[in-house]
Amino acid sequence: MTRISTSTENLTDSALDSLVSVKAYIPDNAMSADLLGTERTGHGTRIRNDGLIVTIGYVVNEAEKIWISSRCGKASAGVVIGNDFQSGLALIKPITPLPGPTMALGKSRDLETSDIIRVTTSARDEQQSIDAQVVSKQEFAGRWEYLIEEAIFTAPANKNWSGAALINLEGKLVGIGSLLIQGFEGNDSLCSVNMFVPIDLLTPVIDEICDSGRRLTPERPWLGVLVDEKDGELTIVGIYRNCPADEAGLRPGDKILKVDDRPIYSLGHLFRSIWDLGEAGRKVPLTIMRRSKQQKVCVKSAERSAFLHKGTIQ
């Protein structure tokens, strides 16, 4: 693989000091505890002189306690400034200022397939900072009612992906690490890749999230289901307790056929069809298949944030 030029390597190496490690502790009764665990670790990137850090949301969502550590060995308790459920990113801050530089925000939309980039983490191992290549930019639908249109997929995969910084050749932050995906189809072969959330999804709303803890636009309708897509079928594989889907009587194993009497053909199409109905609180008419019989179920949607443990959020 083509190496980054010496000057760019020096630039990204100096940016290492803007990376921090993040450890979060989540209560046992939090909605996400069973799925994501009660102790989570990841990375964050300092993006403003006031100490503001961006990380992947699932590391700190519902956290009762957050611990942030810089590369120089200093550490501080932290707080969640705000969550952005549309992008899946979160903003946090240390309570006690931690020294270190900031990383400028780049434009993820300028990345192209085959571009060489740098994946950087706060880990102190051989994968702390590695060269990688953009293998694809495409839609990603996550079974937890999550959809982004131009997710960034890179290879080789970094094993420390949660909150990792994706840095372009100018040394600017263009993405935040979210997933490791095995068996990804790219370049006529299957490979392991990391999926990064484009920073462009967060840049326009950073100030309003800092001021309000969230986007100012109304939240999307949320049902509280986990849905898998396989062989053209959309099957509910999990339901959060006491959430709208649970209250409506949906069950794991139900197959979703239609939204508002319109056939659904993919996971991304399912989520768009639900969100197109209006704001959170809107009733969502579903047609499902249960034990070889079609049924109609109406789910009164809600705001996702209303079901989350507030934790350290300011």
Task: Kindly label every feature range from the protein language model.
Residues 1-14, 100-101, 119, 169, ...:
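C-terminal cap/linker of serine protease catalytic domains
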Residues 106-110, 164-165, 238, 244-255, ...:
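A short glycine-leucine-enriched loop at secondary-structure breakpoints
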Residues 14-35, 119:
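A short, Trp-centered hydrophobic/proline-enriched beta-strand micro-motif
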Residues 27-29, 41, 46-128, 151, ...:
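Conserved active-site neighborhood of the chymotrypsin/trypsin-like protease fold
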Residues 79, 207-214, 248-251, 257-259, ...:
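PDZ-domain C-terminal substructure recognizer with occasional recognition of PDZ-binding tails
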Residues 31-34, 59, 63-65, 100, ...:
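Active-site loop architecture of trypsin-fold serine endopeptidases
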Residues 52-54, 170-174, 245-268:
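Conserved PDZ fold ligand-binding element
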Residues 29-37, 81-88, 137-152, 185-187, ...:
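Gly/Ser-enriched beta-turn/beta-hairpin loop segments
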